[in-house]
Amino acid sequence: MCVFFGECNKVCEHSILAGMDMKEETRLLVIARRNAIPNDERIARSEKACEELEQYFSRTVASGARIAAYHAMGSEVDIAPFAKSAHMHGWTCAFPVMMRDDNDAKDRMTFWDVPLDGTRRAFFDKPARAVTPDDPSLAGCTPCNPREIDAVIVPMVAFDAGNMRLGYGGGNYDRFLRELRSDAVVCGIAFREQEVEAVPTEPHDLALPKIIVA
């Protein structure tokens, strides 16, 4: 089994883990490639991607819009520069929170408005974990109805030329994107090292309308 990477440098990498499914294999290989990007380069390329993201939303999203952003984990594209400057366009940024549901075996991804003050720092200082609505880390934050979100920035593990996306396996964004209004602007963001020849897909998977490549 092999996966091909890059547009100019498509190198076949053979799995050494017997019995691993194609999606898991792709995740491990691509995350390793993303982790190998030097930190200084990752920061510079993230900043450039944020500039492109800001230009794109300036053309497609109205002032006063609410944008579902994210806080970068590990070696993901860091969109913090975009989140910090969004208010200059009149945009509000919401961030994902895994919400614990006692009536459901699975935690649910929700989005919350996080103010541009010490609240945001305290919010991000908490490790990724499932919480309940009364968790102290959410003090000063406001939950968002998916129908009130005007645009979404989608992180990912891998993508291909057809804009198919591979996530981390929880299905959180797959479910969330289906809850949005039909006119919501959806934009993925990733490093070029995350491109593969073909993302392993299932019949229900949908391509993203746009992906900004850093």
Kindly label every feature range from the protein language model.
Residues 4-21, 25, 32-39, 139-152, ...:
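Surface-exposed, charge/polar-rich loops and edge strands
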Residues 16-147:
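N-terminal active-site beta-alpha-beta segment that forms phosphate/nucleotide-binding
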Residues 60, 74, 172, 177-180:
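Generic alpha-helical secondary structure signal
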